[in-house]
From Swiss-Prot:
Arginine methyltransferase that can catalyze the formation of both omega-N monomethylarginine (MMA) and asymmetrical dimethylarginine (aDMA), with a strong preference for the formation of aDMA. Preferentially methylates arginyl residues present in a glycine and arginine-rich domain and displays preference for monomethylated substrates. Specifically mediates the asymmetric dimethylation of histone H3 'Arg-2' to form H3R2me2a. H3R2me2a represents a specific tag for epigenetic transcriptional repression and is mutually exclusive with methylation on histone H3 'Lys-4' (H3K4me2 and H3K4me3). Belongs to the class I-like SAM-binding methyltransferase superfamily. Protein arginine N-methyltransferase family. PRMT6 subfamily. Automethylation enhances its stability and antiretroviral activity. It catalyses: L-arginyl-[protein] + 2 S-adenosyl-L-methionine = N(omega),N(omega)-dimethyl-L-arginyl-[protein] + 2 S-adenosyl-L-homocysteine + 2 H(+). The gene is PRMT6. Keywords: Chromatin regulator, DNA damage, DNA repair, Host-virus interaction, Methylation, Methyltransferase, Nucleus, Phosphoprotein, Repressor, S-adenosyl-L-methionine, Transcription, Transcription regulation, Transferase. Transmembrane segments: none annotated. Its EC number is 2.1.1.319. This is Protein arginine N-methyltransferase 6. Residues 44-374 form the SAM-dependent MTase PRMT-type domain.
């Protein structure tokens, strides 16, 4: 089960974001603090309910880059899966579990916490695999399996990789149910960052200066207002870019090995790192884009398979996560861009992604900005 791509998480309480300099931001935070915070059980229930709708699963399976990568990543590991047991964490409609059965798995435990488990069971039965794929309703943290498993498969990645914190469920399953030396599909993840010039945003910011030539009314005075509205917020914007929007060589700032002990604690404390790059040429810099890739082991004779959400690769439903500066900054060839980025769970809702960004562009003073995924 992946994140509800077109749905919003409920935060149920005060949140982070921004630099705290605008009066309206302060008023909004005060109002948020007055709202009662939801309990973990309530947050989880709302999260699971998002997956009871067919649209979420349609979007995920229709993403050919995603679904083909999982199918190939599983089938290429047929030698490790043949005659073995597999746990599918967050099985959704069951397609990954069926891929595992097609690869020769003896038994697949498809664990799904949302009501869509009923449709998963129907799909399994419709494909004649009910003797090998067992759909188990409930969160993986509470479901009991009859045995340890040889492999775990899961599509746990959210926007910006870590939105919705599903990786923690996979790690719980790894610790409790995976045999020593067992297979994880995918096995690792990497995070990247790069400065960007958003062409669509640039057009929108300049729109108000173009009104006069069309209608004879000068509205260029609204450019500053448009900039505050479109860039001055603290939301992580999920949007697809092209390679042309990237202003410098992407920098990897984090790598997660899912087999690594202690990864759960790292996620709670925050995943991140430093970065430094030089701009290719002259352009308005609007912010940063972050994206990820995950890697599947190659099997006995194949190279590892990489599923990338880079703007230089075919588009996926994950797109990229954009972090806008408060206003554009003009950069030139070889302008130095550096900083530090940390991804961590929000305080009010651990499933909601928060990003802390410290950055410096050229000779400008260092700045910081606190972002959060939209509720």
């Amino acid at each position: 089960m992946s994140q509800p791509k077109k749905r919003k998480l409920e935060s149920g309480g005060g949140g982070e974001g921004g630099e705290g300099t605008e009066e309206e931001d302060g008023a909004e935070r005060e109002a948020a603090l007055e709202r009662p915070r939801r309990t973990k059980r309530e947050r989880d229930q709302l999260y699971y309910e998002c997956y009871s709708d067919v649209s979420v699963h349609e979007e995920m399976i229709a993403d050919r880059v995603r679904t083909d990568a999982y199918r190939l990543g599983i089938l290429r590991n047929w030698a490790a899966l043949r005659g073995k047991t597999v746990l599918d964490v967050g099985a959704g409609t069951g397609i990954l579990s069926i891929f595992c059965a097609q690869a020769g798995a003896r038994r697949v435990y498809a664990v799904e916490a949302s009501a869509i488990w009923q449709q998963a069971r129907e799909v399994v039965r419709f494909n004649g695999l009910e003797d090998r794929v067992h759909v188990l309703p409930g969160p993986v943290e509470t479901v009991e399996l009859p045995e340890q498993v040889d492999a775990i498969v899961s599509e746990w990645m959210g926007y910006g990789l870590l939105h919705e914190s599903m990786l923690s469920s996979v790690l719980h399953a790894r610790t409790k149910w995976l045999k020593e030396g067992g297979l994880l599909l995918p096995a690792s993840a990497e995070l990247f960052i790069a400065p960007i010039s958003d062409q669509m945003l640039e057009w929108r910011l300049g729109f108000w200066s173009q009104v006069k030539q069309h209608y004879g009314v000068d509205m260029s005075c609204l450019e500053g207002f448009a900039t505050r509205c479109l860039m001055g917020h603290s939301e992580i914007v999920v949007q697809g870019l092209s390679g042309e929007d990237v202003l410098a060589r992407p920098q990897r700032f984090a790598q997660l090995e899912l087999s690594r002990a202690g990864l759960e604690q790292e996620l709670e404390a925050g995943v991140g790192g430093r970065f430094r790059c030089s701009c290719y040429g002259s352009a308005p810099m609007h912010g940063f884009a972050i994206w990820f890739q995950v890697t599947f082991p190659g099997g006995e004779s194949e190279k590892p398979l990489v599923l990338s959400t880079s703007p230089f690769h075919p588009a996926t439903h994950w797109k990229q996560a954009l972090l806008y500066l408060n206003e554009p900054v003009q950069v030139e060839q070889d302008t130095d861009v550096s900083g530090e980025i940390t991804l961590l769970p929000s305080r009010d809702n651990p499933r909601r992604l928060r990003v802390l960004l410290r950055y410096k562009v050229g000779d400008q003073e260092e700045k910081t900005k606190d972002f959060a995924m939209e509720d």
